[in-house]
Amino acid sequence: MDLSATPSRSKSGLRSSPRKPVAAPAVAQMDLSTPSKPTPRRKPKAPPVAAPMSPVTPSSVRRSSRLLETPTKVTSETPVKPTPTPKRKRAAPSPSPKTPTQSEPKRQRQRQRQRQQPKKPKKRAYYRKVVYDGGEFAAGDDVYVKRRDGAESDAEDPEAEECRVCFRAGAAVMVECDVCLGGFHLRCVRPPLRRVPEGDWACPYCEAERAGKAIERPKPPEGKRIVRTAKEKLLSSDLWAARIESLWREPDGIFWAKVRWYIIPEETAAGRQPHNLRRELYRTNDLADIEMETILRHCYVMSPKEFKDASDQGDDVFYCEYEYDIHWHNFKRLADIDDEPETKEDPGDEPYNAGNDYVSDSDEDSEYDEEEEPTKCSSARTHQSHALAANLRKGRTYGLQKIGIRKIPEHVRCHQKTNLEKAKATLLLATLPKSLPCRDKEMEEISAFVKDAICNDQCLGRCLYIHGVPGTGKTMSVLAVMRRLRSELDSGNLRPYSFIEINGLKLASPENIYKVIYEQLSGHRVGWKKALHYLTEHFSGGTKIGKQANQPIILLIDELDLLLTRNQSVLYNILDWPTRPNSNLVVIGIANTMDLPEKLLPRISSRMGIQRLCFGPYNYRQLQEIITSRLKGIDAFEDQAIEFASRKVAAMSGDARRALEICRRAAEFADYRVKQSGHTSVNRGKNVVCMGDIEAAIQEVFQAPHIQVMKNCPKFGKIILVAMVHELYRSGLGEVMFDKLAATVLSWCHVNRELLPGYDTLLKICCKLGEGKIILCEEGTKHKLQKLQLNYPSDDVTFALKESPDIPWLSKYL
């Protein structure tokens, strides 16, 4: 939501919450206006005894306050004897040997039976509202929470914020700076203000600092101590903000609350971004149980619409639009979360049922009331005791109580990994290697290109096209260079820049790249047409986007060939922006096709330039070095096993990812073999990956069912698959039209003197391959215009059909 039209926040001395009383210790009371439990019927008591003249010493503070409020009946010193009334005599029942206790009253027998039964423990009582320490708290309220235990500054809560110029707090209207969040009297600003300005307002000191001028802010008078407000403590990570989910009282009388934490942008994995507001918070999925004693007072976290209208709602108002996942470190709009259907929670987490397990609040020292035994197993769970700490987030659940997660045994956590287990974890494709061998020359060229583009003031026409077969380290090399340049930037040896990474596979359509670029620069989401308009103005020298508009922008586009459209307008716009004066844009494109610029329109290929970088396939020595560098310090492979896997993959495609996958699968085979045989480290020869494990992994990877289907295809089916690989590599696209594929097949058959098939025959074979999920086909109504796509990597087709005895000429096209 655009908050640029939000009026500046006025600080008119209005408090957002009542002051806490200083006298009287904190005594929690249940709000009687919203009772959640009916008062149970008390057990019969003995006849009252005449009270003495001296007051009885109360056993608790609660009881003493109750005795002072309740008037005591005064009795006379001379007791008055009641008038005796004649009683009817009853015949005593005859004793019976079978029922010796029949003469006792029935009520006495019930009391005796109750004393003999074990007392049931009290259970926690849930409340909708709780009056605690002079404040009323309910579920759904936002509150400040102490972050440090025993901090004296947390108890300091000034009535109103002081002016940053005169350092006095009065009833005069104050205006807040949107940069430093400081309060200023209208008369103290130079020049003085007559009314609160609309829109964003920055104080003169922040404006001077933005302009690069050296300015000294006013200092408080000598001997005056500045007291920070709760808002300032929260934004400086000295307090927490939380949302109350539920309230209850434990059997020991202590009040607790389950809260959901808020965090400031600095506490996220991404840190504070330029688009974050100064008062912005993120709601998290982190839940915790805290004592009511740690809660200070209310604050108000509002939605964007509410925050826009809250121009005069005090100093404890904050803005929240997203929820932050502390596990996956991603963001989601609260509006999208609120629109989702609510799922039914576990019965143990439902609000308290007022009909069961009531704990009396007015008679804590009396005997436990009898309770009906619950029928649900969830109510029989025992609650853990809570430690008395103000700043510890104990009882974190993260919502795991809804799925009944179990605790991992300690022996599993303390298990020491073997060399084979370490090798399996290291060889994962998702594991980031410590170094990237065999690509030093290419990385130096990329680094020199980026540094030259950054040092150039105008960055005119800087485009770099990187191509190569899959699995040759193109993307990883560029990202390694950018990480190295980032360290130089942090040390102050490089000019500041912005880096944007986009993968074409993650875009729903090529036009969505405009939205991604604009959101990375501004932090706002708009449609792709508006984003294209704003980006064109930005790179043309018009209206700039973001606060870091003058910094160079390095745009990395992976899978560049997926941005091709019918008129190629997307690629034209992206490659045309760097050619404009003062655009400060550098484009690095990565694709698998070598001759992609030649296939583009002349106006696009001319803007792409002639600076290219080719990543050739790895040979077996380079693959062996890559695997050895990953396994450095882990003695889990035989040298011959690594060399055998490297030679096998280098003969096929030179894909490093395929080599790592084979070695990882071989390590799994070896680990399973060792655990099944029960060998220890004494027999070291069988505790490492040997040639047999590599052979088994290769057979599993290259002898998969779909590869067997390719090998057993008819003659024209094999020709169609090889022709698809050839066309996809030549065009650089992910799909091919049937008419182009058929023309290629007919041309090959004519050159190699094969029988020419008809279009219907080729179409039937494509349908058969589609039924086996070897290729993906569109609906058959399009006939010759339908698009075809390989469902498996082209390396599998190469491995399966490179040696076909019935079609020996097919290998020259692979």
UniProtKB/Swiss-Prot annotation:
Region (Histone H3 binding), start-end ranges: 157-181, 197-201, 310-315
Chain positions recorded as Zn(2+) 2 binding sites: 163, 166, 185, 188
Disordered as annotated region, ranges: 1-127, 339-384
TM ranges: none
Tissue-by-tissue expression: Expressed strongly in root tips and shoot apical meristem (SAM), and weakly in young leaves. Not detected in mature leaves.
UniProt zinc finger (PHD-type) residues: 160-209
Region annotated Necessary and sufficient for ORC complex assembly, chain positions: 433-804
Biased composition (Basic residues): 108-127
Motif (Nuclear localization signal): 105-112
One annotated GO molecular function: ATP binding
UniProt family annotation: Belongs to the ORC1 family.
Functional note: Essential protein. Component of the origin recognition complex (ORC) that binds origins of replication. It has a role in both chromosomal replication and mating type transcriptional silencing. Binds to the ARS consensus sequence (ACS) of origins of replication. H3K4me3 effector that positively regulates the transcription of a subset of genes. Required for cell proliferation.
Protein name: Origin of replication complex subunit 1
UniProt organism field: Oryza sativa subsp. japonica (Rice)
